[in-house]
């Protein structure tokens, strides 16, 4: 895919794609972890026996960062000095795809996890509903990962 006549700056867009994949997905994971962790801390004062059961949103938020890491490593390993502008733009699109969808998924997981953990402490039957909603929020990040893998392997 490399082109000998590629502009000198073409690799820049691939590097930005790798950076965007990691930065935005890590921001989403950090927000999801912090927001869910706050709910767990508040809930555990009254119901400490539910702490381990309530850790699921934090784990799911952490998985979002792994999606970004996978794409960032794929992009970084395929960067060369003479990469074509087309390939570099594909890498930028892949990084933005997984990064921004990871940011959105992290926000959703954090908000749902916080409310779900607090609600489950009051009414244990809400646990299954919380898990289902968390799965739908996690899938948002997975969609971005799928699109990013398609783009980065072209």
UniProtKB/Swiss-Prot annotation:
It comes from the Eukaryota. CDD domains: ATP-synt_Vo_c_ATP6C_rpt1, ATP-synt_Vo_c_ATP6C_rpt2. It is found in: Vacuole membrane. The N-terminus is blocked. Belongs to the V-ATPase proteolipid subunit family. V-ATPase is a heteromultimeric enzyme made up of two complexes: the ATP-hydrolytic V1 complex and the proton translocation V0 complex. The V1 complex consists of three catalytic AB heterodimers that form a heterohexamer, three peripheral stalks each consisting of EG heterodimers, one central rotor including subunits D and F, and the regulatory subunits C and H. The proton translocation complex V0 consists of the proton transport subunit a, a ring of proteolipid subunits c9c'', rotary subunit d, subunits e and f, and two accessory subunits. Proton-conducting pore forming subunit of the V0 complex of vacuolar(H+)-ATPase (V-ATPase), a multisubunit enzyme composed of a peripheral complex (V1) that hydrolyzes ATP and a membrane integral complex (V0) that translocates protons. V-ATPase is responsible for acidifying and maintaining the pH of intracellular compartments and in some cell types, is targeted to the plasma membrane, where it is responsible for acidifying the extracellular environment. This is V-type proton ATPase 16 kDa proteolipid subunit c.
């Amino acid at each position: 895919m490399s082109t000998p006549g590629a502009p000198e700056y073409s690799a820049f867009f691939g590097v930005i794609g790798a950076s965007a994949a990691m930065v935005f997905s890590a921001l989403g994971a950090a927000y999801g972890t912090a927001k869910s962790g706050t709910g767990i801390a508040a809930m555990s004062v009254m119901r400490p026996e539910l702490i381990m059961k309530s850790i699921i949103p934090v784990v799911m938020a952490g998985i979002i960062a792994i999606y970004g890491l996978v794409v960032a490593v794929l992009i970084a390993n395929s960067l060369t000095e003479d990469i074509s502008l087309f390939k570099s733009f594909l890498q930028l699109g892949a990084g933005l795809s997984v990064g921004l969808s990871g940011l959105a998924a992290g926000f959703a997981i954090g908000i749902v996890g916080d409310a779900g953990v607090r609600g489950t402490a009051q009414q244990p039957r809400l646990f299954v509903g919380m898990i289902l909603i968390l799965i739908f929020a996690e899938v948002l990040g997975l969609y971005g990962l799928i699109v990013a893998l398609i783009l980065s392997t072209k």
